[in-house]
From Swiss-Prot:
InterPro entries: NADH_Q_OxRdtase_suD, NDH1_su_D/H, NiFe-Hase_large. Disulfide bonds: none annotated. GO terms for molecular function: NAD binding; NADH:ubiquinone reductase (non-electrogenic) activity; quinone binding. It catalyses: a quinone + NADH + 5 H(+)(in) = a quinol + NAD(+) + 4 H(+)(out). Its EC number is 7.1.1.-. It is a peripheral membrane protein. This is NADH-quinone oxidoreductase subunit D 2.
Amino acid sequence: MIASKESNSAATPATSAPTLRTTAEIAATAAMGHAPHETFTINLGPQHPAAHGVLRVLMRMDGEWVENAEPVIGYIHRMHEKMGENRTWAKFLPNTSRIDYLSAMHYTHAWVGVVERGLKIEVPERAEYIRVITSELNRIASHQVWWGALLLDLGGFTPILYAFDDREKILDLLEGLCGARLTYCYYRFGGLYNDADDDFLKGTREFVKYMRPRLKMYRDLVTDNVILRQRLTGIGPISADTCRKYGATGPVIRGSGVAYDVRRAEPYSVYPKLQFKIPTYPECDSMARYLVRMDEMEESLNIIEQCLDLIQPGPFMAPKVPRVIRLPAGDYTYAVEAARGRFMVRVVSDGKENPYRARLRTPSFGNLSLFEETSRGMLLPDALAMMGSLDLVIPDIDR
């Protein structure tokens, strides 16, 4: 049974609902007074701090009110899918760490997972536990970047210093494990590049103990701050139907009350053996999406701790993995729950050394797609706060 965390309405200060202008209200305003009604267009990006990357949003404004906001993408399109079709299965592995560079472990997991499914490779249990540990560490590190950047958008500078300081501890752990701090490429078909030593496992356990009181401090100093709640509560409402309409997943749809998580809906690795909750909030606003991610960091710590207790000595690679990968002709899919939502790999194989077709379904594209509809009638600062709550990574959109 899927568990969910109910929102604590008593802890939320009473705030007045934000004013959203409908098309009719905008037209009525235009008819008032003697001056002719004029709108103007501004470009948010493609180089703007609030865009968090090379994203351009063409915004038609009526004063401070957003009449329409059209995302313009493609500035860093790198043809990952086409490269996947022109490279061997193994040579495409480094690409997976560079699609969503903040969630690299999850993306590599999906690529090796689809190959292992096609070749019916049984991954050793120890390798699966290490994959889950590193994936959840990567999820926390990604949420740290989102948390600090969102508060920076809202005018708070200090929290991002705390976030990056704590994230640095995760990067140090992963660097000691695989030698990289961002684009890891640590997983291999059938297992891992190398085994996790005792120093990594001990350091990870110490990090879990360190991070729990830090998250409580985040909640006391930031989450319960009345200014933050006034900036996010009631801002950017996104209904569950709108999420489904545009294919939004991850914390965005869970912030709209839908307890959809790939780790439960499409179980993979050793997640079925682990106990964890799926945080959901029914309010559908930016504050709900904020709370989902804060709760997810706590759940990731619980998952990591369970894996550390359950992991046993053993091999970290499957004994028989073909040196030359050739998937049997067919259509294969594999999905994971990345930091921003559902990432799915779909490949069509014709039995050769490279895929006939490679399809990468990334979460950020669906999460951005709903911005144009949901931002209409909002004040510009509120629209930027809502965009920050979507946690966009631009290379994940353009691919």
